[in-house]
Design a protein with these regions (language model features):
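Ser/Thr-rich, low-complexity intrinsically disordered terminal regions
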Residues: 19-145
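Bacterial N-terminal signal peptides
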Residues: 7-16
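Positively charged n-region of N-terminal signal peptides that target proteins for export
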Residues: 1-5
Length: 145
């Protein structure tokens, strides 16, 4: 693939994401404990809070949760999901979205195991898949509008 095409593809893949250096509102999700069974990240996007919320909802659904809740919150748009791991173990995922000063939105996600000390990277991989699915949903939304 010619270098200019590769650059165009990479630009298109990262277009919905705002540079991380720009400030994000304070993270409304709980901190992770000092154990390696939790992942908590924040990302900035150019999309409106409503568009990002819809993309996050589709992304969570695509990962096959046991349950997906949409709690009412005036401070931040929130989603909560439970995923089953192995036979009996459950992991909790929380998502919050806030408007950023100057436009765009901040997306916060926290994925944590309910029990155990280590999750062997399960929550990190889930967050990575979730963020990838959010990017895909945003690209799909922008191509249909």
């Amino acid at each position: 693939m010619p270098p200019f095409r590769l650059g165009a593809v990479l630009l298109a893949l990262t277009l919905p994401i705002v540079a991380e250096a720009q400030s994000l509102p304070d993270n409304p999700l709980s901190d992770c404990p000092d154990t390696p069974n939790c992942e908590r990240v924040a990302r900035g996007y150019e999309a409106s809070p409503d568009t990002l919320y819809a993309a996050a909802e589709r992304a969570l659904e695509s990962l096959g949760p046991v349950t997906l809740r949409r709690p009412d919150s005036s401070a931040a748009r929130r989603l909560e999901a439970v995923y089953r791991v192995a036979l009996l173990f459950k992991d909790d995922v929380a998502v919050a979205i806030r408007a950023r000063d100057g436009g765009g939105s901040a997306l916060y996600v926290r994925s944590a195991s309910r029990v155990g000390h280590s999750d062997l990277g399960v929550n990190r991989r889930r967050v990575d898949r979730f963020l990838e699915a959010v990017g895909t949903a945003l690209r799909d939304a922008s191509s249909t509008s």
